[in-house]
């Protein structure tokens, strides 16, 4: 296969490896949250994509992605995911927040908005607790988190697998 043919896919493989490293670093940051007060949902399907982390807790709901290098399209993706989740929480009184974690990012968190008016917080190492407290939302109580965990666990029986109705389909 000619090098020119493989360069495009090689760049995507390298970018995916960077996203994997960033997500692992964010997993460590999220791991410092108090599990009694925060529900951390991994790889939630929102807005047509898999979102690495969705946090439900006392300071609100936050949809988080992670990348070593972010783009304005990434801002749109996490915003679309947050908007999708907002549709599932019609009585929730606060906005669903969105953010992109960039490991090694220097400086304070910043709120970015693109030309489509999609927005997200960009933040780096050790800023997650500050960012969550910054929102000031009255989010989920510990009792709400316990109830949400129980409802989620009851939604799909343990060990069940949903298979396509016809072999070879989707």
Q: What are the roles of these predicted feature ranges?
A:
Residues 54-66:
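Active-site beta-strand-loop-beta-strand hairpin of nuclease catalytic cores
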Residues 1-49, 59, 68-170:
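Surface-exposed interaction regions that form or flank ligand-binding interfaces
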């Amino acid at each position: 296969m000619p090098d020119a043919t493989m360069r495009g896919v090689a760049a995507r493989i390298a970018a995916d490896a960077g996203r994997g490293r960033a997500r692992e670093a964010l997993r460590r940051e999220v791991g410092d949250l108090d599990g009694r007060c925060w529900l951390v949902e991994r790889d939630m399907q929102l807005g047509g994509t898999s979102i690495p982390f969705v946090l439900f807790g006392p300071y609100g709901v936050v949809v988080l992605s992670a990348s070593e290098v972010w783009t304005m399209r990434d801002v749109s993706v996490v915003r679309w995911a947050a908007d999708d989740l907002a549709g599932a929480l019609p009585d929730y009184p606060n906005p669903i927040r969105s953010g992109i974690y960039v490991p090694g990012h220097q400086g304070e968190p910043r709120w970015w908005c693109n030309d489509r008016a999609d927005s997200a917080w960009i933040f780096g190492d050790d800023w997650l607790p500050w960012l969550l407290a910054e929102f000031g939302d009255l989010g989920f109580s510990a009792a709400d988190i316990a109830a949400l965990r129980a409802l989620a666990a009851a939604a799909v029986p343990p060990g069940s697998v949903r298979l396509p109705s016809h072999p070879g389909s989707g």
